[in-house]
Amino acid sequence: MGKIIGIDLGTTNSCVAIMDGTQARVLENAEGDRTTPSIIAYTQDGETLVGQPAKRQAVTNPQNTLFAIKRLIGRRFQDEEVQRDVSIMPYKIIGADNGDAWLDVKGQKMAPPQISAEVLKKMKKTAEDYLGEPVTEAVITVPAYFNDAQRQATKDAGRIAGLEVKRIINEPTAAALAYGLDKEVGNRTIAVYDLGGGTFDISIIEIDEVDGEKTFEVLATNGDTHLGGEDFDTRLINYLVDEFKKDQGIDLRNDPLAMQRLKEAAEKAKIELSSAQQTDVNLPYITADATGPKHMNIKVTRAKLESLVEDLVNRSIEPLKVALQDAGLSVSDINDVILVGGQTRMPMVQKKVAEFFGKEPRKDVNPDEAVAIGAAVQGGVLTGDVKDVLLLDVTPLSLGIETMGGVMTPLITKNTTIPTKHSQVFSTAEDNQSAVTIHVLQGERKRASDNKSLGQFNLDGINPAPRGMPQIEVTFDIDADGILHVSAKDKNSGKEQKITIKASSGLNEEEIQKMVRDAEANAESDRKFEELVQTRNQGDHLLHSTRKQVEEAGDKLPVDDKTAIESALNALETALKGEDKAAIEAKMQELAQVSQKLMEIAQQQHAQQQAGSADASANNAKDDDVVDAEFEEVKDKK
């Protein structure tokens, strides 16, 4: 049996690993790098470039250089998150005939799995070059909170790349495998906080060790499939564009070449600010007008970056609370916190996570490589090369059937460990009913139509009887591959019908495509509801923080500003009681606009506090780095 390679197909970077004996090894690509940018470029002469070569030519070919495709995979074009990307991406995102988000590359319509397959092909080639033999099988990781459509699209990408995807596993689970495999960890409960380029996950995982065998059991998972480093970059890019417009009167958003240079510079500045207190974004000849060439030279401090992205970091905290609650644990039950994903290198992210869990995250896990290593370990488990490891993952959403009155009745609740099997007895709704329809659903909503439809089948031949008399046993069985088998049996006549719903493979192409479309169509309103809840949470946070700042500002806030802010707060509070997401966002925007003076006062107060703190510690501190950081930040504020 050949090697099963492990691939972390990331939004920003991808990584491939294999099992080399009992150890996982991350492989270097043709350019000598252990990670590969998830960037694909289609050149004018018909060449397809992947990784660093694609990144290098992006400035001169922005419309045909594709990045962050994982944010589009398995998504509908009308999704709000996709529409946001439409407005900021230099390439063209279009709606496919089936309503999915596709891309227009040099006039050709391309599906996200088709494009992601190019990255997977490079990962496959990297492994083949190292092993000196063909590679046909892989374990590919996905965010824990990816839905069926996104998982299936990822699997399709693997198939297009010439890989049989033996298992799709969740990124935090893979990171836990990488963390726990070679350590004498004993029995521990860990939290894996995974903030990557485009997605965020939190998983609570229990590692048990009995007689040398390690069991990795996922207790709960949560997340946000449209929150990541790309969003942080966008905030910084928008700030730089606005500053340049104020200074030069030119809006760079209309210049794709300038925006591509700015994207690279913003990403570089963000990375630098993880270790430095300030950096310069220096882009000579960024654009030109009638008066001649224009240059950008803007200082950005760590404090400024943090102020731009604080709400994004805070957005990751709510899923932590939900995951802990679902696991039935408190923060004191967590032994270790593991950070995964490049964006977790940001000091503010590390600080917020440490504050939430009351302990410092571990530093001995490589955030860029852990997921690929875990995928390789799972590949080793499947081939039998890795022994004494048992991985128990969970189903992220509840599974059930539609019952009388259009109600969703769950048979398997979310965060149930797989494999699992559950049966329940139902009956007929009408006298002498001879058949029942079993409609299989996925989701957390009470109304059946608000959940995702996974398929349906009929059970015929029920003997005539008064309503409520026949006994129909419905059984849900999920195996270790995440494949759902549903059966319905009339206990009186013995008649039975079955359906297999697979999140991986086995159905023919036409059936797979139909199920994906059906599931997406039925999940549309649920996505909108989730977005509304998310916006409400953001609105609540803004309401609370602004009121707190008004209170702290006291008499320093002019009466006119205070009146305007109070009015905007009341308007936002009213909007939060409604169901209109756009109205809530509009009121949040209005509040932000009238709160400028308040922000200035808050920043001044913060600077004064920092100055006092720096003066007090300057005489005593032994750690030069800390003193420098405090001193620099105060200087920037002044």
Swiss-Prot record:
Cross-referenced CDD domains = ASKHA_NBD_HSP70_DnaK-like
Q: Which residues carry this modification: Phosphothreonine?
A: T199
Question: Per the UniProt record, which residue ranges are transmembrane?
Answer: none
Give induction info: By stress conditions e.g. heat shock.
Bias (Low complexity) occurs at: 603-620
Give the region (Disordered) as residue ranges.
Answer: 603-638
GO MF: ATP binding; ATP-dependent protein folding chaperone; unfolded protein binding
Q: Which InterPro entries match?
A: ATPase_NBD, Chaperone_DnaK, Heat_shock_70_CS, HSP70_C_sf, HSP70_peptide-bd_sf, Hsp_70_fam
Cysteines engaged in disulfide bonds, as pairs: none
Which Pfam families does its entry note?
A: HSP70
Tell me, in a sentence or two, what this protein's role is.
Acts as a chaperone.
Under PANTHER family, the record lists: HEAT SHOCK PROTEIN 70KDA (PTHR19375)
The UniProt family comment states: Belongs to the heat shock protein 70 family.
Name the chain's protein.
Chaperone protein DnaK
